[in-house]
């Protein structure tokens, strides 16, 4: 399998979708590590890349000698999550990489791990899990706001983005459900989601449409205010 990296060039104000254009740049083959790659995440400077492997049931870590340039990537290590989840899908980190979060649809949980040092999966240890089964039986992607007091899980069964609050940032044991936003008009099998820095733009990828759907949020990181 190959990871295809699309560089989206946005105007800093994110005023209109006309200001964004996707241009194919390069690809990087990860088939030696996994044949069913799922979510893709970078560290802040792009010198580390992480890919969820559903076949291997693990998180694969790569280094990039040039940040965000996949042609410079090389495999480092992997971390097996099968003791907690046999169908891992989505992945997220806190800001310094000392916490890693994995969501999967075997147990329908967001799993929390500690890493020391940050962004080094070889040091990961399991901490806790938070069930999202009441909201969706096929959770496939997740994201947090900047301080970890909000968590978002996209679900393939109900085709929505579920929002949670965390009373302690990046601590899933303190999570509680808030609201959901339906994306079925745009995508009937959503896979993953990302936000811009202030949460006023949300991007949802989908299997059926094979595209990236963009939404505006009049209140940052509040899905009840989202519009396509």
Regions found by a protein language model. Give the residues of each.
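Short loop/turn segments immediately following the C-termini of beta-strands
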Residues: 54, 105, 156, 207
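Residue-level detector of Asp-centered blade-edge/turn motifs that repeat once per structural unit
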Residues: 42-45, 95-96, 146-147, 197-198
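Boundary at the C-terminal end of the N-terminal hydrophobic targeting segment
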Residues: 18-20
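Short loop/turn segments immediately following beta-strands, especially the blade-tip
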Residues: 61-71, 113-122, 164-173, 215-225
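Bacterial N-terminal signal peptides
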Residues: 5-13
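A short beta-strand motif characteristic of beta-propeller blades
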Residues: 24-31, 74-82, 125-133, 176-184
């Amino acid at each position: 399998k190959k990871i295809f990296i699309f560089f989206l060039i946005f105007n800093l104000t994110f005023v209109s979708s006309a200001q964004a254009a996707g241009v194919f740049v390069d690809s990087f083959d990860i088939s030696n590590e996994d044949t069913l790659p799922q979510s893709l995440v970078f560290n802040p400077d792009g010198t580390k890349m992480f890919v969820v492997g559903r076949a291997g049931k693990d998180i694969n870590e790569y280094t990039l000698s040039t940040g965000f340039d996949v042609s410079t990537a090389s495999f480092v290590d992997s971390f097996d999550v099968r003791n907690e989840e046999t169908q891992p899908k989505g992945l997220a980190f806190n800001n310094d990489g000392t916490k890693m979060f994995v969501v999967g649809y075997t147990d329908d949980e967001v799993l929390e791990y500690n890493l020391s040092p940050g962004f080094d999966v070889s040091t990961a240890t399991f901490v806790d899990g938070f069930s999202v089964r009441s909201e969706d039986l096929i959770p496939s992607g997740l994201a947090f706001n900047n301080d970890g007091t909000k968590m978002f899980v996209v679900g393939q069964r109900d085709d929505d983005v579920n929002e949670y609050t965390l009373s302690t940032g990046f601590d899933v044991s303190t999570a509680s459900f808030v609201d959901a936003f339906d994306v079925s008009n745009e995508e009937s099998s959503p896979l993953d989601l990302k936000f811009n820095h202030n949460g006023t733009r949300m991007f949802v990828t989908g299997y059926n449409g094979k595209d990236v759907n963009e939404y505006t949020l009049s209140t940052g990181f509040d899905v009840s205010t989202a519009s396509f």
